[in-house]
Amino acid sequence: VAVGEKTPEGAVDVACIVSKPVEGVNAGKIENIELVSRAIREAVSEAEEQLGIRITEAYAGISGDFVRCARHMDHVFVYDPQNGVNQKDVDALFDRMRNVQAPDDETIMDRVPQNYVVDDNQEVKNPVGSFGKKLSSTFNFILCLKTPMQRLDMALKRVGIKMLSVTSNAIATAEAVLLPDEKEEGVAVVDI
């Protein structure tokens, strides 16, 4: 359990980290909800005692072979090509990606644009202001089987914690340790 506070700049100041041994998890999958809930309860209680606060909500991380990535490409036609791509065109593309459905047994945890292409030939980081008739993008979808996520949510609810959202531990680790230019250059984080 890590407890932090968001700074005005959007960073997170970590106030405390509490780790407890846990049984009932195999390859990232919760197999015994009682054992997992007990370990969460112990860690949360210790963090609450250290900080003098009550924890009722949490952002959770999840990892295992049931988390995967899939790419999806789509496009929109630029609303006003004479004036170039604007934020409404980018938003329209995001809306199309939000309508992409996961298989029945999975849920989409995140949708991350990998690149933008204007008129099938000009790749750009930020398409706003570019000229063209068609805006395309390849998005990386982070997918997770529903059952492991539901069990994690259930374990947190058993100790009175509402799960605000869940993210892939791999994504969370990269966000925590890599600078924006390192991510742009393709630096890899290896968590052993």
Predicted regions and their residues:
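Nucleotide/phosphate-binding catalytic cleft detector across ATP-hydrolyzing
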Residues: A2-A58, I62-V190
